[in-house]
Structures are given as C-alpha cells and as structure tokens.
Amino acid sequence: MTATKQHKKVILVGDGAVGSSYAFALVNQGIAQELGIIEIPQLFNKAVGDAEDLSHALAFTSPKKIYAAKYEDCADADLVVITAGAPQKPGETRLDLVGKNLAINKSIVTEVVKSGFKGIFLVAANPVDVLTYSTWKFSGFPKERVIGSGTSLDSARFRQALAEKLDVDARSVHAYIMGEHGDSEFAVWSHANVAGVNLESYLKDVQNVEEAELVELFEGVRDAAYSIINKKGATFYGIAVALARITKAILNDENAVLPLSVFQEGQYANVTDCYIGQPAIVGAHGIVRPVNIPLNDAEQQKMEASAKELKAIIDEAFSKEEFASACKN
C-alpha cells in the first residue's frame, strides 16, 4: 500500500462479536472505502446480513462498499484483520485458547496468502501475541507487516482507570501497559504522566493516593476482561475501537505511536523471537520501528518474565507436527 492511494480496502476475517463491532466502528468513523467480511460457509449469511445492515448506516456517515467477501477478495486489500477464533469463556485465560485457535489461524492465513495478498495483517484473535507470531510464521511476511492489537486495549483501560482516579480527561493521561496481552502484563509506572507531569510528582502535588490504591487499580485493569466476561459473556466494544484506531493509523499513514504486539529482536535485553506488547510507530507499511521505552529494573524483569511465558507457549505449540514446519521458515 502506498501513502497516496485513495481507495482503502479492508478485509475482516471473523464476523463474531468483536468482528461485527469493529465493522460498525469503521462505518461510524468513516474509515476505509471498502470493507469485505469473511465468515465460514455455515455463517456466510450472517456476513451477508451484517453487510446489509451496516450499509443502511452509510447515509449518516460516508460512502463505503460493504459486502460478504471470499478469500480471493483479499488479493488487493490493504489490510486483513483477523478476529476469528474460539472466544474466551468464563474461567479461561487467553493462553488457554492456543490449542483451539492455532489451527484456525493457520487455515485463515494460508487462504489469505494464497489469494496473492500483499498488504498488512492485523491480528486481534486471542491469545493475540501467540497468534500474531503464528501469522508471521504461516504467512512468511516481513515482521513489519504482521501486527497484533497487543496491549492497545489494556493501555486504554489503564489510562481510563487513572483518569477516573484523578478526575481528568483520559486523553490527558499518558501511560502504557506492556508485555503479554494477558495475565503477565505490567504497568509502566515509571513513564506514566498527566499532561507531561510524571505521575509520581502529579500525585504528590494534586492528591494523596496510596500505593495500595495504585496496585488495586492495575489489578482491575489486568483482570478487566475476566470481570466483563463473567457479567456479559465477552468483551468486544473496547477492542473494536482499538482496532479501528490502529486501522486508521495504517490507512492514513499516520506514523502514530500505539501499544501493539511487536516482534522482538533484543529491544529489551533477553526478549527475542516473539511478539509482545510495546509502543511502536505504525503507518502505511506497518511497523516503522518500535519505541523502546527505558524500563526500570523491576519493569525489565516483568518484561522478560512475560516474554518467557509466551515463548514457552509458542515452543510447545509449534512442537506439534502440524505446525512444526512453520518454524523452519
């Protein structure tokens, strides 16, 4: 995709709760000029119905071609977004989904690549860091053109939680969650700030917040998905808008800094050969470069521990015969 191309085409693979919410976000925000929705054959009519339903909103937003797509429609797409996979159930961790979703991911990526697709993959299916890695392996694409949603939603939750605690606009809070999109993620407290003022200094000047309150706040962010899943069965609105934001950055060649699942080549000491959440510059050609925030010793240890856990899952998954050949690529 070139920065000057005017007609932007997105193919969505997976029309479940996350996928359909993402499609709705694209329509609402006027992102892309063409949206194709791919579903498995037995759910093809769901994609047809959603495309028709979404098209009825176009008179209120902006022109867009929306349709139920097939894999051959990926050939000239700028972006393929993968949300398809088994959903996380109450009591399950995201990493519990590996066995179910790796085979699904392989079949999807194989079909997309077979179409002649030359664009960018954006992965949101869980466990997103593992499935972003598998998308890279199965596709043979350059690492810059395979991106995961990573900790984009976690960071948004973190900013919102801090904003509520401090009674300020979340857009004025700048803070990141890094590591796995899951239980081993961590807050980068050392670089959190409000309007450029270091969070620690801001808290001293503005209000007295105990450390225990901040620990509880982070735990609420980390466990937010479990809380929502127990209440309503799934999370989809937040991640849908996060995906729309990433999509906009790619299609508009923004060179925006967003927390994404990014390939690691030693940016953080011993963290290599995996995808994991960190800030990165993203534009029309995918990841321009990672933004390597200097971590303190405690944060560095958490980053390495998170990567170690992901690597163990990846190594175990790709030791199986049906996936082992991808690791030789």
Swiss-Prot record:
Determine if Hydrolase is one of this entry's keywords.
Answer: no
Q: What class of enzyme is it?
A: oxidoreductase
- What does the UniProt entry say about where the protein is found? Cytoplasm
Question: EC number(s) of the enzyme?
Answer: 1.1.1.27
Alphabetical list of PROSITE patterns matching this protein: L_LDH
* Phosphotyrosine: residues bearing it: 226
Keyword Phosphoprotein carried by entry: yes
Annotated catalysed reactions:
(S)-lactate + NAD(+) = pyruvate + NADH + H(+)
Q: Which GO terms describe its cellular component?
A: cytoplasm
- GO terms (BP aspect): glycolytic process; lactate metabolic process
Quote the record's binding site residues for NAD(+).
18, 39, 46, 71, 85-86, 107, 124-126, 149
User: Which residues are beta-D-fructose 1,6-bisphosphate-binding?
Assistant: 159, 174
Summarize the activity regulation: Allosterically activated by fructose 1,6-bisphosphate (FBP).
**Tell me, what's a Pfam family for it?**
Ldh_1_N
**Domain of life assignment:** Bacteria
Gene Ontology molecular function: L-lactate dehydrogenase activity
**HAMAP family listed in its UniProt record:** Lactate_dehydrog (MF_00488)
Subunit composition and interactions: Homotetramer.
Task: Give the similarity note.
Answer: Belongs to the LDH/MDH superfamily. LDH family.
Q: What is this protein called?
A: L-lactate dehydrogenase
